[in-house]
Amino acid sequence: MKLTDRWFTSISEDKKGNIVFVNGRLELDEFRLSGKLKIRIEIRWSYEADEHGLPTESAGKQIEEIELLIRKAMEKDKLAIMTGNYTGGGTKYWVYYARTERVFGERLNEVLAPYETFPLEIECEVDTDWEEYLDMLSMKDENSI
C-alpha cells in the first residue's frame, strides 16, 4: 500500500457559523479496506484565534510545526495515517486512523516532549468502517481545491 500526499480543501461551517477549512486526504481506499487501521484518533487543539476564528500568525506557525512532526512520527512506518484536518472556530482538529492507540499515544508523547504543555484533547474510537473519513470525503465537491 502506497501512501500518497494528495489532498482536497473545502470550506464548511461549525455549529456557531464560523468558517472551517476542511483538508481531506485522497487515495486511501487500500488502507481503509485493509482493516488494519481500525482506531480513529482525533486530536483537538484550541488555539489563539483572530476575529474570524482562524489561527493568529503565531498560532498558525506553531500548529504547522507540530502537525508536521506528529505526521512524520506516525506515518514513518504507517502506525497511523492522517486522513484529514479541520481549522476554524478557534480549534484545530487532526484525524488519524491507527493500528493501536497505545503506541500512538507513546509516539505523540515523544514528539511533544521537547515542548511546553499544549492544550490538546484526544479522543479514540473504534471506526472499522472509516465512517468519519467517508463523511469528510462527502464534503469534496466541484468547488474543492
Task: List PLM regions with ranges.
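Residues at beta-strand starts and edge strands
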Residues: L37-I41, G90-K92, F118
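Conserved short beta-strand edge segments in small beta-sheet-based binding/regulatory domains
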Residues: A113-I145
